[in-house]
Each structure stands twice: as structure tokens, then as C-alpha cells.
UniProtKB/Swiss-Prot annotation:
Gene for this chain: sqv-5
Phylogenetic lineage: Eukaryota, Metazoa, Ecdysozoa, Nematoda, Chromadorea
Summary of subunit composition and partner proteins: Interacts with mig-22.
Residues bearing glycans: N278, N348, N443, N477
Protein name: Chondroitin sulfate synthase sqv-5
Protein's job: Has both beta-1,3-glucuronic acid and beta-1,4-N-acetylgalactosamine transferase activity. The beta-1,3-glucuronic acid transferase activity is controversial as it is not detected using the purified recombinant enzyme. Adds the first N-acetylgalactosamine(GalNAc) to initiate the chondroitin chain. Transfers glucuronic acid (GlcUA) from UDP-GlcUA and GalNAc from UDP-GalNAc to the non-reducing end of the elongating chondroitin polymer. Together with mig-22, required for chondroitin synthesis. Plays a role in early embryonic development by controlling cell division and cytokinesis.
Biological process terms in GO annotation: egg-laying behavior; morphogenesis of an epithelium; positive regulation of vulval development; reproductive process; vulval development
Cofactor: a divalent metal cation
Length: 736
């Protein structure tokens, strides 16, 4: 056994060695002290007179005094950089539209900071936007100078603050959570430039002075640069700007980075999905189909602010769905959770059974107890929900696909069943065709298989919210005060007896409505043979202390759209308008629901009215009923295709564009207004069956000289109002 003992020998240390060590220690101390002192004495806000950098045409300037936004900090010990800074380029004509829309949507969900770069002298009415004004830069297109100046500003002011920098346009949508997840998987200490690689379109291919193996990151879908890339390219921006070979700023930025940093854009096929660029139909990009959103980090181009808000809402829905699914999964793992079962409710009676609806190849729906049953085209809402369900289903299937060495891909839906349990959720039985792929050697194979999937979507917990809190939240941005009076606007030409019935009914409603139901009536009166009788009825209403305003139209062609707009023009912007017809009867509760379902600057109400069939088709029991407020299958139907009755505030009517006053005669003006309200994007449209609104049957006469679209609508409404399907079947049965 060998024993090791500590030596007692000491090596002599010379005086020169000690002096060198002390000098090194003293030098480090002085350097640290001077660095810290410099960081304290340097200005942190770029004032109007301060130049950044050495080039006049690349100098940049900020005139907003927000120290949190424009901080030039040094890397102090323990300083931790943020993840990403998004730099958005925009022009003066878009700063208050596209740029502000971006700032209010996806920019609020970026895990870092967002700055908006504009030309020198650009002003905005929105003080909350973080604008950076670039000195000596204008809105000349192509924006090479603006792009290079922005990159230089980032390098000299923000390089020590963030690991990643994203150059973006004002028509780009970014999913912040997915961007953060992607960037945290990449080493930020190395030089990177990430985006969708491009070589130019078909007209420019071969004309961009690119080498056989060169590419560039397309500017539209966004360009991500690491901090190292930004610092290395910054000193060479002046030279690159003076020696451009094309007019495309993204091509030249990529060329400059490739030359002086030595990295090129990520040449990866998957980047086409992650940084998605829609080149097929720029004007309608993502307006209808947003299937690319699920797999994308960025979407480009979205030039319409309404579409941008729609895409943002869809993205938040996806995140909410994921959060709910995670909550449901965690809840199911609790020891107190109920065991999962396909039978969520045991019916006690036959009427408690919820019928299943059959879906044939995702195109035809066979249903019961719904509108247009038993067979009709699958609604867009159902198609969208099923697509989301299938996508989520396969995402869960493929969670551990790499470890298992196999992946499942959806092909098509053969058929399916669906039912809605009102207190539980939605149940699906889906027969699907899918690809089963094994990608791990030596058993690589692809097989087409058919499988059944049983899917349950569970509703979230009920929440109660008072009407006062709800309305105050919805109208938080409104500067107008809602008028409590319900202003009914009604065009009238002839039909004295029908108008007398309407007036008598309105008189009785107002008599028992109480103080909380203030109603006024605006009549847009056209000349007719029985005009004097109508005027006598108007005086009777005025004698009943009902405010009545008459707008004289004279002997001109009847146009419902023109009449309703004339009536609305006489009222203030905060007036609650209810467009109605002389054939309508209503209850006091219906008028109160109209008031509660209409919110200024937030919500428009299109009630679905109950329309009577021809009285000749009624059964004897229906004819014996005293009033109109009964709802049998043979008595009438809820007119889902009619939009003539609507409630909204005048400010919202003008915001959506109002009625089309070029339409003459009967129909189409209501459909046009409804479509405008839907496309507006800012206002929510609520549409529900309203049992308190009943349209009394009257013979419909369709003028054959009407435009084709109006004539088809008129004939369709006339046919639908003759009798119920049950009555028609009984009539046919007599001849079989």
C-alpha cells in the first residue's frame, strides 16, 4: 500500500510575478468602474438633436418621450435580455389604419416589445402607439432606405436588450405564442436569419443577381435576425445601401447579411408553412379560409383591417380552445372526477331523447326539429366546428408520433353523426378515412385505413353577468349616451285598414308598457287613395300621447330603403331605431327585448319574426284562437330568411353604410343591410327567434317588372307563406 503525504516544499514566487498579478487585478477593476460610470452618464432618451451613428442619411430620431420604449442600455452584470423585438415598417397613409390595427391586435400578445417605424415628420392621432421617426427618411417606395435605417437603429439602440429581432410590414399577422415557442428552440447566441426563403417570382427569377446557391428571406412574411447577426451587419449597412443591385429591400438586406455575416436565409421547406405568404389572391387573403393559421407563425398579406381583426379573433379562439382542453384534461385526472362515458345523460322519457343528425360526406345534413329539415346543406358553423374538432383530434393522436415512429393523417370524412346536449355539450360519431404512416426503418409503410372516432365536446361552466356590467363593458369606448326612447320607423303607402289595426295595437301596448317603455313612431308617408284615412289614424295616435312624426314623401315611387333612411335622418346619432312594417304586431316584452339586445357602438339586433301562413290553410282550432300570438306548425313559421325588421342605433346604421337607396320597390334592401353589418367586423350581430313579433298574413303581389333578384325573393316569400309542409302533404294525400 502506498501512502501519499502532503509535501512540505514551497515554490518561491518572484516579486515580478506578484506585480503582474496586481496590475491585472487593478486593470480589471478600473475597466469595470469606467464601464459602470459610462452607463450612468450616457443619455437614455434619443432627443431631437442627438445623432445616432455616423451617417447623415441613416441617422434616426425619436420624438416620443417614452423612456420605457426608447432605452439605450449597456450590458451590466446580471442583465437579462428579452426574447424578441418586433420592428414594423409603415407609411404615413397607413399609420392610423393598418399600423394602429396591428398595435391593437397581435402586438398586444408579443413576448417582448413592438416598435413602429415611420418616416420623419409622420404624425398619428393615436398617442398610445410607440412610433420611431427615422431622420432623413421619407415614404418613398421601395423602402430600402427606411428598412436599412430601421436595422441600424435596432443595432445601436436595442442590441443589448433582446436576443431576436423581427422585421415586419404593417400587413403581417404574427402569432406571438408560437413565435416564442419556435425561437426558444434555436440557439440565439449564433448568427441566424430566419424566414421563408425566396428566389423571386416568375417574372424576376434570374434577374436578382443571386448566385446558384443563394437566396434571401422574403420581407412580407417577416425576417427574424439574431442579435449576433444584427451587430455584425450594422457596420456595413452604409456600404450595402450604396451598392444595391436591385430595388427590393429584402433582397438587398439578405445580400448584405450573406456577404458580411456569412449566413443565408433558412432553406427549409417547412418555413413555407411557418412564415406563410399567400400570393394567389392578395385582395382576399385569409378573408374566408384560415386553414393556414393553425400551423403558421406569421400570415401575409392582410391589408384589410377588418380581416386582420377576424384573423386575430380566430387565433384567440384557438388559444382559448387549447386552454379549455388542457383544463378539461387536468380536471379528468383528479381523484374526484367522474369516469368518462359515452352516455352523459340518462333520459327518463321519450321526449328527453336528443336525436342524432346524420352528415353525409360533409355536404348534406339530415336532421329533425330544425329549420329546413330533414335535408339541407351543412351550415358553415357546423363545417368549421367539425374541421376544428378533427384537427384537434389528430393533434392529440400525433402528440408522441416521433417516439412511436408512426403518424396519422386525415384524408376525408365518409359520414358522421352529431347531436347537441344543451346542458352537456356536443357528441360526434365520425367515420373517417385516414393515412397510417410508419416512418421508422425497416418497417416504413403507408396504409389507408378507415376508423370510427367518438368525440365529446363539453361545454364550459355557466357564468352569470349582470346586464349593467355587460352593457358598460360593451360600450366602454363610446362617447355617446344611449337615448332610452325606442324610435319606430315605418314606411306607409295606402293600406288604411291595416294601419288602423297597427295603430290600435300600438296604443294598447303603450298603455300597459309602463314608464320604462318610451316609444315614438316615425311614419314615412307616401301619397295614396286612402291617404285621408291614414291621417285620421295618425291624429288618433297623437291624441293618445304617442309621439308621432310624419315625413311627407309625396307621389313618388315606393322604395323601402329610401323611406327608412329618410326616417333615420330626422333622429340624432344616439337614437335607438327599430325598422318595422305595418303588417307587424308585437308584445310589450318584445319591445323591451329589442332595447336590451341593442347596444350602442357594439351590437345590432335582427330578430327572427313569426310569420303567419294563409288563413285558408289553418285548421279549425287555429281559426278559433283569439289573438295572433300562438305558434303552431300549421299556423305559421319563423322567417329565418327575412331581415326586414332590425334594431340599431343611428350611429351604427351610418357606420355600416345604411340602406341602399338605389333599390326600388319590394325586397333586397334588408338583405343588403344585413350583409353590410356582418362585413363591418366591429359590430356584433345578434339574431334569434322573437316570439313577440308576429307578421300577419296578407296576399303578396310580385311585380313582374322588378329586377330578377327582387322578383325571385318575392316569389320565394310568397310560396313559403301559403301553407305549412304538413298541410301540403295532407292536400297531396287526397289524390294518392
Amino acid at each position: 500500500m502506498r501512502v501519499f503525504q502532503r509535501s512540505t516544499c514551497r515554490m518561491p514566487v518572484s516579486r515580478a510575478t506578484v506585480t503582474i498579478l496586481l496590475g491585472i487585478l487593478f486593470g480589471f477593476s478600473i475597466t469595470y468602474y469606467l464601464t459602470a460610470l459610462k452607463s450612468l452618464t450616457n443619455p437614455i432618451i434619443c432627443g431631437p438633436e442627438q445623432q445616432i451613428g455616423g451617417f447623415d442619411y441613416l441617422d434616426v430620431i425619436s420624438q416620443r418621450a417614452d423612456a420605457d420604449v426608447f432605452t439605450r442600455s449597456q450590458s451590466l452584470p446580471g442583465h437579462r435580455r428579452g426574447l424578441i423585438l418586433v420592428a414594423i415598417m409603415t407609411a404615413a397613409k397607413y399609420v392610423d389604419t393598418r399600423a394602429y390595427n396591428v398595435w391593437k391586435t397581435w402586438a398586444q400578445h408579443i413576448p417582448g416589445r413592438v416598435l413602429i417605424f415611420v418616416a420623419e415628420g409622420t404624425e398619428s392621432v393615436h398617442e398610445d402607439m410607440p412610433l420611431i421617426r427615422l431622420k432623413g427618411v421619407d415614404d418613398t417606395y421601395p423602402p430600402q432606405k427606411k428598412s436599412f435605417a430601421m436595422v441600424k437603429w435596432l443595432a445601436e439602440n436595442m442590441a443589448d436588450e433582446y436576443d431576436w429581432f423581427l422585421r415586419a410590414d404593417d400587413d403581417l399577422y404574427i402569432r406571438g405564442e408560437e413565435l416564442a415557442l419556435f425561437l426558444r428552440s434555436v440557439d440565439s447566441s449564433k448568427a441566424h436569419i430566419i424566414g421563408q426563403a425566396g428566389l423571386g417570382n416568375s417574372a424576376e427569377y434570374g434577374l436578382l443577381a443571386l448566385g446558384s446557391t443563394d437566396n434571401y428571406c422574403m420581407g412580407g412574411p417577416g425576417i427574424v435576425m439574431s442579435r449576433d447577426t444584427l451587430l455584425k451587419v450594422s457596420p456595413h449597412l452604409e456600404s450595402c445601401l450604396q451598392h444595391m443591385l436591385t430595388s427590393h429591400e429584402d433582397v438587398e438586406l439578405g445580400r448584405c447579411i450573406r456577404k458580411h455575416v456569412g449566413v443565408a436565409c433558412t432553406w427549409n421547406y417547412e418555413m413555407q408553412k411557418l412564415f406563410h405568404n399567400n400570393q394567389s389572391a392578395i385582395k382576399e387573403s385569409y378573408a374566408k379560409n384560415m386553414k393556414e393559421l393553425k400551423d403558421a407563425i406569421t400570415l401575409h398579406p392582410i391589408k384589410d383591417p377588418a380581416v386582420m381583426r377576424k384573423v386575430h379573433l380566430r387565433n384567440r379562439e384557438i388559444k382559448l380552445r387549447e386552454a379549455r382542453a388542457k383544463r378539461s384534461l387536468l380536471s379528468s385526472e383528479l381523484s374526484t372526477a367522474k369516469a368518462q362515458t359515452l352516455v352523459r345523460m340518462t333520459p327518463n322519457r321519450t321526449n328527453d331523447l336528443t336525436p342524432w343528425e346524420y352528415i353525409n360526406n360533409n355536404k348534406i345534413l339530415f336532421c329533425a326539429d330544425r329549420v329546413n329539415c330533414p335535408r339541407h346543406t351543412v351550415d358553415l358553423s357546423i363545417r368549421t366546428e367539425m374541421a376544428d374538432t378533427i384537427t384537434q383530434l389528430f393533434d392529440e393522436f400525433n402528440t408522441n408520433a416521433r417516439q412511436r415512429g408512426r403518424v396519422l393523417q386525415f384524408q376525408s370524412l365518409q359520414y358522421g353523426y352529431m347531436r347537441v346536449e344543451p346542458t352537456k355539450g356536443v357528441d360526434y360519431v365520425l367515420d373517417m378515412l385516414l393515412w397510417f404512416k410508419k416512418f421508422r426503418p425497416p418497417n416504413r409503410t403507408t396504409i389507408s385505413v378507415r376508423r370510427h372516432a367518438y368525440v365529446q365536446q363539453t361545454f364550459g361552466k355557466l357564468r352569470s353577468l349582470s346586464e349593467g356590467v355587460f352593457r358598460s363593458n360593451m360600450r366602454a369606448n363610446s362617447t355617446l349616451i344611449e337615448d332610452p326612447t325606442l324610435h319606430m320607423i315605418m314606411p306607409l303607402r295606402g293600406r288604411a285598414a291595416i294601419f288602423a289595426r297597427f295603430a290600435q295595437h300600438l296604443k294598447s301596448i303603450c298603455a300597459r308598457g309602463g314608464d320604462d317603455l318610451a316609444v315614438s313612431l316615425t311614419i314615412v308617408l307616401y301619397s295614396s287613395e286612402d291617404e285621408m284615412e291614414n291621417r285620421e289614424t295618425i291624429e288618433m295616435l297623437r291624441a293618445s300621447f304617442i309621439p308621432v312624426t310624419v315625413i311627407e314623401m309625396g307621389d313618388v315611387s315606393f322604395s323601402r330603403g329610401v323611406a327608412l333612411m329618410r326616417g333615420a335622418e330626422t333622429l340624432p346619432a344616439n337614437a335607438l331605431l327599430f325598422f318595422t312594417d305595418v303588417d307587424m304586431l308585437f308584445t310589450c316584452d318584445a319591445l323591451k327585448r329589442i332595447k336590451s339586445n341593442t347596444i350602442l357602438n357594439a351590437q345590432i339586433y335582427f330578430p327572427i319574426v313569426f310569420s303567419e301562413f294563409s288563413h285558408e290553410s289553418w285548421s279549425e282550432n287555429d281559426k278559433l284562437l283569439a289573438d295572433a300570438f300562438h305558434y303552431g306548425r300549421g299556423r305559421g313559421y319563423f322567417r329565418h330568411f327575412g331581415y326586414g325588421l332590425a334594431a340599431m342605433y343611428k350611429a351604427d346604421l351610418m357606420d355600416v353604410g345604411g340602406f341602399d337607396t338605389k333599390i326600388e320597390g319590394w325586397g333586397k334592401e334588408d338583405v343588403d343591410l344585413f350583409e353590410k353589418a356582418i362585413k363591418n367586423g366591429r359590430l356584433r350581430v345578434i339574431r334569434v327567434p322573437e316570439p313577440g313579433l308576429v307578421h300577419i298574413y296578407h296576399p303578396i303581389h310580385c311585380d313582374e317588372n322588378m329586377p330578377t333578384a327582387q322578383k325571385d325573393m318575392c316569389h320565394g316569400s310568397k310560396a313559403a307563406s301559403l301553407a305549412s309542409i304538413d298541410t301540403l302533404v295532407e292536400q297531396i294525400a287526397q289524390y294518392t
